Curated annotation (Swiss-Prot):
Keywords: Magnesium, Membrane, Metal-binding, Methyltransferase, Mitochondrion, Mitochondrion inner membrane, S-adenosyl-L-methionine, Transferase, Ubiquinone biosynthesis. It is an enzyme of class 2 (transferase). This is Ubiquinone biosynthesis O-methyltransferase, mitochondrial. GO terms for molecular function: 3-demethylubiquinol 3-O-methyltransferase activity; 3-demethylubiquinone 3-O-methyltransferase activity; polyprenyldihydroxybenzoate methyltransferase activity. O-methyltransferase required for two non-consecutive steps during ubiquinone biosynthesis. Catalyzes the 2 O-methylation of 3,4-dihydroxy-5-(all-trans-polyprenyl)benzoic acid into 4-hydroxy-3-methoxy-5-(all-trans-polyprenyl)benzoic acid. Also catalyzes the last step of ubiquinone biosynthesis by mediating methylation of 3-demethylubiquinone into ubiquinone. Also able to mediate the methylation of 3-demethylubiquinol into ubiquinol. Mg(2+) binds at residues 211, 214-215. It catalyses: a 3,4-dihydroxy-5-(all-trans-polyprenyl)benzoate + S-adenosyl-L-methionine = a 4-hydroxy-3-methoxy-5-(all-trans-polyprenyl)benzoate + S-adenosyl-L-homocysteine + H(+); a 3-demethylubiquinone + S-adenosyl-L-methionine = a ubiquinone + S-adenosyl-L-homocysteine; a 3-demethylubiquinol + S-adenosyl-L-methionine = a ubiquinol + S-adenosyl-L-homocysteine + H(+). The gene is COQ3. The lineage of its organism: Eukaryota, Fungi, Dikarya, Ascomycota, Saccharomycotina. Disulfide bonds: none annotated. The keyword DNA damage does not apply. This protein may be expected to contain an N-terminal transit peptide but none has been predicted. One of its GO terms (biological process) is methylation. S-adenosyl-L-methionine binds at residues 79, 142, 165, 210. Its EC number is 2.1.1.64, 2.1.1.-, 2.1.1.114.
Amino acid sequence: MMVFLVSFISVEMKSMHCAPLFRQLVFSRSLHYSKTIFHNGRGLTSTSESEMSHFNALASSWWDVNGPQRILHKMNLLRMDFIHDTIRKNLKLNENTDDEVYIPPFSVDLLPQGIKNKIDEDQEMRRDEILNDSSLTVLDVGCGGGILSESMARLSFVSSVKGIDLSADVLEAAKLHKQKDPMLKDKLSYTLNAIEDIPETERFDIVTMFEVLEHVDYPSRVLLEGLKRLESGGWLFLSTINRDFVSWFTTIFMGEHVLRIVPVGTHTLEKYINQSEIKDWLQEDSNRKSEFRVADTKGCVYLPAYGWKFTSCPDVGNYFMAIQRVK
């Protein structure tokens, strides 16, 4: 089954242009609907009753690593890698210091291996120093049962994490699980809030929206509210799903109905958002264009025998995105 799935996806990614009739029948209405919804900034950041009911039903099993949310538990490892790696590689190594590390104006790969290793070692040590002196604040939007929130709160360079969600049942599961680790008591808090309930004057170094935008009614509004709450230089990390055949095949057909590794009804094709649509949305407004930059976008895929892994194609299937507030 796994060989078939990977082979099928590989063929489909190379030959999607060969099925225009299929795409027209399945995706023409979806494309129009999703673009309209994404660009509608007038609605509130709430989600539908059906979405709420679906996630409320999962509350009691949220922390069962072999249960309905096991895919999220596995994805959390990739989330943490993406956040950590993005922050580290974008640190300003020689800011506010007289003891500068050498940053060559060319690729270190051109240097002899010994010199390259020394430069890399010095830079990594400086990154460690900067992070050890950091005290970052985090807002986890759509935190669910707290899988990511707890992981973020355990990072040494994070001082506080606030998780918000619209499901009281799921938040109760998060609060109960938090009590199992006394070290989280003063670093992690949960509140029943939509993001617009958080004062715009309350800013965070990191805002996360993993697997959120495809579950809300007006994703552009949610994304905008998240960006507004970033400190200058802060990061918004998100993950969602491209609206294409591969996504439908892997997440809905295979994931929900064949392999049943995701609860049926978790995903709605029309709510998927192409990564290009988010980038276009950021560029179409002059203020957003000058204030924010997309620093990285990575595709990712779930392989049942392996787990989640990054891919080199963010235009197909699931993807992660890092957006930085530059001023």
